[in-house]
Amino acid sequence: MKFSPAYLLAFAPIVAAHFRLQYPTSRGFNADTMANFPCGDLAQSSNRTQVSLSSGSFPVALRMGHDETAVEVLLALGNDPGTNFNITLHPTFRIEGLGEFCLPNVVFDESVLGTKITDGMNATLQVQSNGDPSGGLYACADIQFSTTAQDEKPSSCTNNTGISAIAFTGAAAERNANESTADGQAQSGSSGSSSDSGSHSGHSSATQTSSTTASSTAGAVALETAAWGILGAAVVGGLAVL
């Protein structure tokens, strides 16, 4: 059986990518280096996404290439933070399904960041997932908080038909995604530390932060999507739990 080039190209993005960070604008994508911490070995971008200070939150849009994925959203403050992704914006949870997925309101207020946010402050967002079959996959976006930026939802913040999110609880939520399976269990051979070379030092503080953030800001950092109906879950205190 022969398939047309157009047919094959339609499936190429999902086949080629473990996941893609669509928004904020990512540093790029390289499937060969995506397993390297931090940021899939991609250099810092000079084109920082402007994030409205007054909004108190911003969307994180992804394109998923695996039907079950553990995902975590981290942040590092500063112009060039290196491996210091010690702020948990969203603890580890599971995404089920392929294609577009969006968290429309990822909170970044002072209680989450642990410091006062000022106009012009730079930061780097890192979305990390469980690896295939082990370790982690990493994608980063460089951002700048701004008092003049508009609070607008990007067109990429959408959810594909059939995609859903499931909140982890307890140890599964506290475990870094690069140490987790898609089911929220510890990866084989991982005893609380990352199985990725060089990533443990960068995530030791993130693990501690995740533990406190998951409990103290679960209501504020809600597991929500642009279309609430796709969760198929009971919403308790703003956090969807199955």
From Swiss-Prot:
Q: Pfam families under this entry?
A: BIM1-like_dom
Low complexity compositional bias: what residue ranges?
180-214
Return the GO cellular component terms, semicolon-separated: fungal-type cell wall; plasma membrane; side of membrane
What main location does UniProt list? membrane
**UniProt keyword annotation of Glycoprotein present:** yes
- The segment annotated Disordered runs over 176-214
Query: What are the protein's UniProt keywords?
Result: Cell membrane, Glycoprotein, GPI-anchor, Lipoprotein, Membrane, Signal, Transferase
**Signal sequence annotation:** 1-17
Instruction: Indicate how the chain sits in the lipid bilayer.
Output: Lipid-anchor; GPI-anchor
Propeptide positions in the record are 219-242
PTMs per UniProt? The GPI-like anchor contains a phosphoceramide lipid group. The anchor position has not been determined.
Spell out where the chain is glycosylated. N47, N86, N122, N159, N178
According to the Swiss-Prot or TrEMBL entry, at which residues is a lipid covalently attached (GPI-like-anchor amidated alanine)?
A218
On the tree of life, the source organism's domain of life is Eukaryota
Q: One GO molecular function term?
A: transferase activity
Q: What is this protein called?
A: Uncharacterized protein AFUA_6G02800
Q: Which organism is it from?
A: Aspergillus fumigatus (strain ATCC MYA-4609 / CBS 101355 / FGSC A1100 / Af293) (Neosartorya fumigata)
Q: What is the lineage of its organism?
A: Eukaryota, Fungi, Dikarya, Ascomycota, Pezizomycotina
